[in-house]
Amino acid sequence: MDETKSTNLLTKRVIVGIDQTTVQHKGSLNQAEQDYIALEVPVALVYNGISHVVMMASPKNLELFAVGFSLSEGIIGSSNEIRSIEIVESCHGGTEVQIELSSRRFMQLKERRRSMAGRTGCGICGTEQLAEIFRPIAPLPFTQTFSLSLLDNALEQLKTVQEIGELTGCTHAAAWLSPEGQLQGGCEDVGRHVALDKLIGLKTQQKWTEGAILVSSRASYEMVQKSAMCGAEILFAVSAATSLAVEVANQYNLTLVGFCRRGRATVFTHPQRLTD
């Protein structure tokens, strides 16, 4: 490890990784080395004083997470329905994100409120009824196109928003691509759903409307649903897509592309938005 680096990985005054002494096994040799470990902390989203969900996440860009989660979960329809967001460190080693909703939205939330302890890879923990899993989303229009010839360069650009991942090998990334294939911005997190929610918050903040989403993970149905909820018509995933992701993408008119690697990709649904 470079001795000029801090003992903690510090990003914009937020500690997102720590030093850890490890034993590296290489061939027949065991050697003690310092390594970076990505921080994973409990983050509670609290709406109008009532805890709604606890997710395991990287302690960075939590305001964006609050906005993105609220939008992708249908808690709000517009960021204007959030009156304030405050980040409060908890005495239990976690973080509370205190979100003040408009009265109308909070009343609606109370009607459908669920208490759940989320995990890094879990998007439906604590959902009380199966009907709540599939949200009624209007089919997306066909207004966006994207050239697959731009994908290789986009994959290279994705590395620029994976600062924590480069040092720890432990995070997922989600990025917004312009129709010309330029990376407009991105977010990373130990949880793939959280990384996407943070991106949705960033997309809302920056008012991006045209383009596509690129994620470093697989495409589960939750990733498809969150993308559709924010109006994205195209979702590129570095890894595979699940059967339910393909089914939901078809239902929402979302173009789903998996196995995005240099020189190749697999188009699962609605290829008409893609050009060579």
From Swiss-Prot:
The keyword Cytoplasm applies. Mo-bis(molybdopterin guanine dinucleotide) binds at residues 259-264. Keywords: Cytoplasm, Molybdenum cofactor biosynthesis. The active site is at 122 (cysteine persulfide intermediate). It is found in: Cytoplasm. Coiled coil: none annotated. The keyword Cytoplasm applies. GO terms for biological process: Mo-molybdopterin cofactor biosynthetic process. GO terms for cellular component: cytoplasm. Required for formate dehydrogenase (FDH) activity. Acts as a sulfur carrier protein that transfers sulfur from IscS to the molybdenum cofactor prior to its insertion into FDH. This is Sulfur carrier protein FdhD. The gene is fdhD.
